[in-house]
Amino acid sequence: MPNFASIWEGVADAVPDAIAAAHGLDSHSWREFEDRSARVAAAIDAAGIGHDDKVGLYLYNGFEYEEAQFAAFKQRAVPCNVNYRYLADELAYLLTNADAKALFFDVTLADRVAEVRDRCPDLQLMIQVGGGELLDGAVHYDDLLASHEPAPRIERSGDDLWFLYTGGTTGNPKAVMWPHAELQKSAEAFYRPLGQPVPTTVEAAVAAAVELHDRNRTTRVLAGAPLMHGTSGIVSLQVLMTGGAVATLPSRSFDAKELWEVVAHHRLTMLAIVGEAFSRPMLEELDRAKAAGQPHDLSSLFQIMSSGVMWSKESKTRFLEHKKLTLLDTLGSSESPGQGSQLTKGDAEQAKTATFELGDTTVVITDDGRIVEPGSGERGRLANRGVVPLGYFKDEKKTAETFPTINGVRYSIPGDYATVETDGTITLLGRGSVSINSGGEKIYPEEVEEALKSHPDVIDCNVVGLPDERWGQTVNAVLSLEDGAEISDDDLIAHARTRIAAYKTPKRILRVESVLRGPNGKADYTWAKKTAEEITGIS
């Protein structure tokens, strides 16, 4: 299997006028995408940055993010996602951990870059995206494009790397090391319309992309979450590999009206989102527009995919009331995409929450290494042997823990616990690292959150444990409610008790104006724990 850049170059040659990237209402063809990226690659090469050198992407969504990534791939360098919410210490840690030699950064983040550059001894090239005053020692992205001819194409390898830094739930961010060839295996679903497996050569991949274009089956996806997040990052690589197009939104905070306008303008076929943080405002905007007699045009949209967090049955049902769509609820992580899925095709009665069909290469394994039998009631961790990264960069201990070899088979086991039902489906319980131990019972926050969020007055919720002399820990729900909601704490707890066992229900309801989430829509349990401690005085 080849490097992504080699495939994308072939696609650009084969379908040069097709759309490759869109940002808001603007778009770039494959010809433009390849040419601009090749010029950036020339600048990287001129700075002496090449094979296995790390390139940080401290950027918001936009053309520049995808071009910088393509450019790094072209030179066999390793692009590294950098969370744009990181402040100086977090930024310095990641850049030094990665041994980053180049950094693309947004102009609004220049002050943070200035604060850390002297702490990053390997950093030798800084490229500023956006107008405004240029950071001393940096170069403007647009000047870089204008001053370089496209870099010549070179031989590459499928063993070249892509780094996906994951914050996880505890500790410093870690880079998951993905060889291009391994990650390409996860694109299987995008080749199903052709009835073929994932191509393993540039020629086969380009031929498949051309056939998808000829049959009008090319995927045009809107990456709703930031590209620096695993969901958008991985799906964008997969879609571009098939000759499709990736669209992003220009607003720095999520704007559902803008999303639906971009879907209609570019005739997008797929949305990639992250659960309820996206679904709720999207549905509210659909309802508003419909009530105003100006419904959004969903005619091109075929599928909505969510990954990374739980996606409620209620939201799925409401989407299906607007259009008969395919709803794909995928179970995966930065370390293990495609562990399972829950598919709903146009029938609201099928919509479920947190119940998934296991992928062909995924099993549930107990902590002592046994495979969980269906209907046994045992809990185990999801283990995927199909698509497995090399490990974590500079962390052999964590690599050995997360990617063990069991009975001669290497698995990716990030830590998501589940039970296996009699019919072979799994019920996701949550990540073990944030589980709550109350009276000897292990309680997973996602279970409790989903029970509470099923109440119409609850906007969002995080559940955390607080210390307790009798029980060890208690369950505490930090939640936000709809304006004007008058429901009592006791009624909320009673509602949760209709969905989950009594011992899992919250001891305390802690009300906040809004629940803080990351830009990728994922729960910020550090914030939730601190908030719960401040409200209760317990720590």
Annotate the PLM regions.
Residues 46-47, 77-143:
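Structural core segment of the AMP-binding/adenylate-forming
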Residues 148-167, 171-172, 198, 211-221:
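Conserved pre-ATP/AMP-binding loop-to-beta segment of ANL
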Residues 129, 501-523:
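AMP-binding/adenylate-forming catalytic domain of the ANL superfamily
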Residues 19-62, 66, 70, 87-92:
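Conserved AMP-binding/adenylate-forming core of the ANL superfamily
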Residues 184-224, 228-272, 285, 289-290:
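Conserved AMP-binding/adenylation subdomain of ANL enzymes
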Residues 86-93, 103-105, 384-385, 390-394, ...:
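AMP-binding/adenylate-forming catalytic core of the ANL superfamily
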Residues 363-385, 419-423, 485-489, 523-525:
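Conserved beta-loop-beta connector loops within the AMP-binding
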Residues 241-244, 268-273, 283-350, 361-363, ...:
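Gly/Ser/Thr-rich phosphate-binding loop
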